Design a protein with these regions (language model features):
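Conserved mixed alpha/beta catalytic, RNA-binding, or beta-rich assembly cores of soluble enzyme
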Residues: 100-102, 147-280
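Conserved, well-structured core segments that form the ligand-binding/active-site neighborhood
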Residues: 60-189, 203-208, 212-214
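Conserved small/polar residues in nucleotide/adenosyl-binding loops
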Residues: 282-285
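Short, ordered loop/turn segments at secondary-structure junctions
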Residues: 3, 10-13, 75-76, 141, ...
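Short acidic, glycine/serine/threonine-rich loops at helix termini
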Residues: 17-22, 51-54, 81-86, 146-151, ...
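General beta-strand structural signal in soluble alpha/beta enzymes
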Residues: 6-9, 34-43, 50, 72-73, ...
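An acidic, phosphate/nucleotide-engaging active-site surface
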Residues: 21, 25-85
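Membrane helical hairpin/interfacial module
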Residues: 3-29
Length: 285
């Protein structure tokens, strides 16, 4: 009663690291002011709120820092590039998402081999220094449907998120063959995975710090999702893409994303074929 809620995009450097780009991404998921019944305030400005346990400065979105309270909402699932007790979830949403491009750059500066440590360290610092009210963790099933929604007090986020991550791992989609000659992917996009296509399913990992999924000799990509707004992160892990994908690529958005996370592999452009048929012919054994 009496609250005046508003929504803040918590997505690090996504959306081309611009306020407008991040708001557009939310709108692509149906998160609009009309649908949600409250304002969406998108900004890349950050404010220092304290230091980590190891002495590093902690910054989060300025509007979030100045709000009376923050409710962190996010999906919990295995990450595409590193392993640890906290992967894609609320701790990462705070450390990198609320930290905007600054937070993303700091957490990625030491590479994915240190990402698990940095997510936990910065996440704990934000819980300590920011006005976090609670967290809302979402776990999906293998069909991208909501399996569980768990509300956690800020004191319980650190304890409960690893348990929800284990549950999410058990219900991840998977391809039941261990290996194949050619893997055909109809669409990739940031709405499916930060890497465009989830390597936990496709096996197309861009770092050596995570593994799993099917082992494909070649990967063929046919299209980008409309929701990804031209961000073709993940094309670099394919063998071949269509001209249709190439013509939609917003390379500036891709490169900002790739440079921020210090991993250029996913932003590379592979062989480009005229149509789906040529893609399949080129990759066929």
């Amino acid at each position: 009663n009496g609250a005046a809620p508003f929504i803040i995009p918590a997505m690090g450097s996504h959306g081309g690291a611009t306020a407008e780009g991040q708001k557009n991404l939310l709108e692509g998921y149906g998160i609009t002011e009309k649908n949600m019944g409250c304002p969406i305030h998108s900004s890349m400005d950050v404010k220092k709120i304290g230091k980590t346990a190891d002495g590093r400065d902690v910054y989060i979105d300025r509007l979030a820092a100045e709000a009376d309270g923050i409710i962190v909402v996010g999906r919990i699932k295995p990450h595409t590039a590193f392993r640890g007790p906290y992967q894609s979830g609320l701790m990462k949403m705070m450390a990198i998402g609320l930290g905007k491009q600054y937070g993303a750059s700091v957490c990625h500066a030491e590479g994915f081999q240190r990402m698990g440590y940095n997510v936990q360290t910065f996440g704990n610092a934000i819980i300590k220094h920011a006005n976090i009210l609670c967290g809302v963790g979402i776990v999906e099933n293998a069909f991208d449907e909501t399996r569980k929604i768990k509300v956690m007090s800020k004191e319980d986020i650190g304890r409960m998120e690893p348990e929800l991550l284990k549950e999410a791992e058990q219900h991840m989609p998977r391809i039941l063959w261990p290996a194949c000659d050619v893997l055909i992917v109809d669409e990739i996009g940031k709405n499916f995975s930060g890497d465009g296509m989830d390597p936990n399913v496709t096996g197309s990992f861009a770092t050596p710090y995570a593994s799993g999924g099917i082992q494909a000799e070649r990967i063929c990509l046919l299209d980008l999702s409309p929701e990804t707004h031209g961000n073709g992160m993940g094309t670099g892990m394919a063998s071949v893409i269509t001209r249709r994908i190439f013509n939609q690529l917003d390379v500036n958005m891709m490169y900002i994303n790739a440079m921020t996370c210090k991993n250029l592999n996913g932003s590379r452009i592979p062989c480009v074929m005229t149509n789906d048929k040529d893609c399949l012919l080129y990759t066929s054994p």
